[in-house]
Amino acid sequence: MKNIADIRQEYTKSGLRESELPCDPLSLFSRWLQEAIDANVEEPTAIIVGTVSPEGRPSTRTVLLKGLHDGKFIFYTNYESRKGRQLAQNPYISLSFVWHELERQVHIEGTAAKVSPEESDEYFRKRPYKSRIGARISPQSQPIASRMQLIRAFVKEAARWLGKEVERPDNWGGYAVTPTRMEFWQGRPNRLHDRFLYTLKTDGKWEINRLSP
C-alpha cells in the first residue's frame, strides 16, 4: 500500500471571494448544491450526519438530503436508530456535505426536530415500493442473526401488503434541521483554502467571518 502520508492533492479549481457572498447562507448553499448536481457529482445530496450520545460520544453516518424548506434541511430515517435515539435526548446535530469533484465542503450545525406525520407520510408514499417494505421490517442499528433474517422478514411483509398501499411505520419519518452555523470551504492552492463562517445572531441576521485555513 502507498504511504498514506504521501497522498495529497493540489486544489486549483475555484475560489470564494467576499464579494460573492450573499447575506443568507441558504442562498449560497442552494447555488453550490445545484452546481454539484450540474457537475454530475456522485451522490450530491449525501450528508454526513453527526449526533452525540448522553455520555458525549459522537457518531456519524451518511444519509441523503430530501428537502430544503423554509431554511431547514430535511432527511428521513428510522426514529429508533442510533441517531434517532440520540436526537431524542440531544437535538444538536451537525451536517457535512463534501463535493470532492468541486473541491468544496459545507459544514452545518443546528438543531433537529421531527417533521409532521403528514409530511413524513407524503414523502414515504413517494419512495419505491421495495424501499417502503424495507423501512417497515428493518430494526435499524440493532444486531441481527443473519442477512437471511432480513430477507425472510421482507418477503413476509411484502406478501402482507400485496395489492395495498404500504403504510409508513410510526418509527420512521423525517427530521428538519434548523441551522445556526454554516461554514463554506473552497479548496485553494498551497493549502490556503477559502473558509467563510455564517453564524446566526439573536436578531435573526447572519454574521459572516473569514476563517484561517
Swiss-Prot record:
- Entry annotated with the keyword Oxidoreductase: yes
Xref: Gene3D superfamilies: Electron Transport, Fmn-binding Protein, Chain A
Instruction: Name the pathway it acts in.
Output: Cofactor metabolism; pyridoxal 5'-phosphate salvage; pyridoxal 5'-phosphate from pyridoxamine 5'-phosphate: step 1/1; Cofactor metabolism; pyridoxal 5'-phosphate salvage; pyridoxal 5'-phosphate from pyridoxine 5'-phosphate: step 1/1
What this protein needs as a cofactor is: FMN
Q: Which domain of life is it from?
A: Bacteria
GO terms under biological process: pyridoxine biosynthetic process
What are the protein's UniProt keywords? Flavoprotein, FMN, Oxidoreductase, Pyridoxine biosynthesis
Q: Which family does it belong to?
A: Belongs to the pyridoxamine 5'-phosphate oxidase family.
Quaternary arrangement and interactors, per the entry?
Homodimer.
Give the protein name, as stated in the record.
Pyridoxine/pyridoxamine 5'-phosphate oxidase
Q: Which organism is it from?
A: Bacteroides thetaiotaomicron (strain ATCC 29148 / DSM 2079 / JCM 5827 / CCUG 10774 / NCTC 10582 / VPI-5482 / E50)
Query: Gene behind this chain?
Result: pdxH
